[in-house]
């Protein structure tokens, strides 16, 4: 089971939270499509800003968007000009008040989305798929890191028959629900067609917090 399903979806409600946090009844479908448009617009506009994920929260007619990025300076711009232009564009897109928060990713080598996109960009620049994967694993597996696994799929090296090839180091316990595993995919557009990239990064176990029961008379 753990080998097949999305590791993030499997852990939602256990050690992971939803990336869209709001409640709606009749207009639920419209808001889901609106979230999709917001994410697509941000990822397209900030495709060079190393954006990992976008979290969306809603309250009344206000939308709070949190952008996790490894290059906050590029997102904010000089004097906040870029983030203000982005806020106005999103307000025009949705017709609602938009508030944008920027969160810096301090360890991009531990972010599966950024690692997958880095491998994809190297493949587009004609770097060997073996070399791209091995370099990504070496950067991720520094002292104290638990494990990482990468996989590339399709016509590797221009071969006639599609295949997959993966590399791993350390442990990636997909069946352990308390294991904090980050997972992401990316696509590389090459002269031989698209190549799919998958990355799993194990960042250690997340143990539930123990609530201390208050005992009377102590």
From Swiss-Prot:
Gene3D superfamilies cross-referenced by the UniProt entry: 3.30.300.20, Ribosomal protein S3, C-terminal domain
PROSITE patterns tied to this protein: KH_TYPE_2, RIBOSOMAL_S3
Top-rank lineage group of the source organism: Bacteria
Cellular component annotations (GO), alphabetically ordered: cytosolic small ribosomal subunit
Molecular function per GO: mRNA binding; rRNA binding; structural constituent of ribosome
Matching InterPro entries: KH_dom, KH_dom-like_a/b, KH_dom_type_2, KH_sf_prok-type, Ribosomal_S3_C_sf, Ribosomal_uS3_bac-typ, Ribosomal_uS3_C, Ribosomal_uS3_CS
GO biological process: translation
SMART domains, sorted: KH (SM00322)
KH type-2 domain: residues covered: 38-106
Subunit structure: Part of the 30S ribosomal subunit. Forms a tight complex with proteins S10 and S14.
The protein's role, per its UniProt record: Binds the lower part of the 30S subunit head. Binds mRNA in the 70S ribosome, positioning it for translation.
Family: Belongs to the universal ribosomal protein uS3 family.
Protein name per Swiss-Prot or TrEMBL: Small ribosomal subunit protein uS3
Organismal lineage: Bacteria, Bacillati, Bacillota, Bacilli, Bacillales
Gene giving rise to this polypeptide: rpsC
């Amino acid at each position: 089971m753990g080998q097949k399903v999305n590791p993030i979806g499997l852990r939602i409600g256990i050690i992971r939270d939803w990336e869209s946090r709001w409640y709606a009844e009749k207009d639920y479908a419209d808001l889901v499509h609106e979230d999709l448009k917001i994410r697509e617009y941000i990822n397209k506009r900030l495709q060079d800003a190393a954006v990992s994920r976008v979290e969306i929260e809603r309250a009344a007619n206000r939308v709070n968007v949190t952008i996790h990025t490894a290059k906050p300076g590029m997102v904010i711009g000089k004097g906040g000009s870029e983030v203000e232009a982005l806020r106005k564009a999103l307000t025009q897109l949705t017709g609602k008040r938009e508030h944008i928060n920027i969160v810096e990713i301090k360890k991009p080598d531990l972010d599966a989305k950024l690692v997958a996109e880095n491998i994809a960009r190297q493949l587009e620049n004609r770097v060997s798929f073996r070399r791209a994967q091995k370099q990504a694993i070496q950067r991720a597996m520094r002292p104290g890191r638990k494990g990482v696994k990468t996989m590339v799929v399709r016509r590797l090296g221009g071969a006639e028959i599609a295949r997959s090839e993966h590399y791993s180091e350390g442990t990636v316990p997909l069946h352990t629900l308390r294991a904090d595993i980050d997972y992401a995919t990316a696509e590389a557009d090459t002269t031989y067609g698209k190549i799919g990239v998958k990355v799993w990064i194990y960042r250690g176990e997340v143990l539930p917090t123990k609530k201390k029961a208050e005992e009377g008379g102590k």
